[in-house]
Structure formats: structure tokens, C-alpha cells
Amino acid sequence: MPKSFDIQVAAEDGDIVARVSGELDLAVRDEVVSTVSGALDGVRPDGRLVADLGAVTFCDSSGLGALLDLRRATSDAGIRMVLRDVPPQVARLLDLTDVDGWLPRE
């Protein structure tokens, strides 16, 4: 079975950009949190964690939980987190769960 998920993390202009593609669900939740959390040391004091979700094809409550876990980790580290290129299906989940204050969109 082909892998339906990928995450690439890179430093860009003092920010950490995590590009997520495929299905963001329970099967990949721990991988997302550990991969991105491990990169937070590379953020400048005025930098951000940018979660680029433009290639996400599916997100369930576990995927949302991973994003909220990352939000808590960035908050604890004094780093801002924003979501970029949020697909309509993910936007609907964010709207239904009323987490816009926790997960602002760019």
C-alpha cells in the first residue's frame, strides 16, 4: 500500500515551515508531533512555526489534535504558530470545532 502521508520541515527566513501532504489522521499523529517538535529549536525568537496544509487531503480529530499539540508546544516555547493554505475540508473542521483562536490562519 503506498504511503498516503508526508511531512517536510525546513527553515525559511527564521521560521520553521512544516509542509504536510496526504492524510492527517491517527496513523500519523505521533510522527507529525515528534517531527515538528524536534525542529522548534531552529526558530528565531521572532520566528514562527508555519504549518502549510495546502496538500492535506484529509484531516480527522486526531489530525486536529496533532495541530493543537503543536500549538501548545510552540506556546510553551514562546513561538507563534500559524496555518497556511488551509484546504476547505480542514477549514470546515476548524470552523466546526471553533479553534480559530488557537490555530490562526495566514
What kind of feature is each model-predicted range?
Residues 1-58, 69-106:
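STAS-like cytosolic regulatory interaction modules
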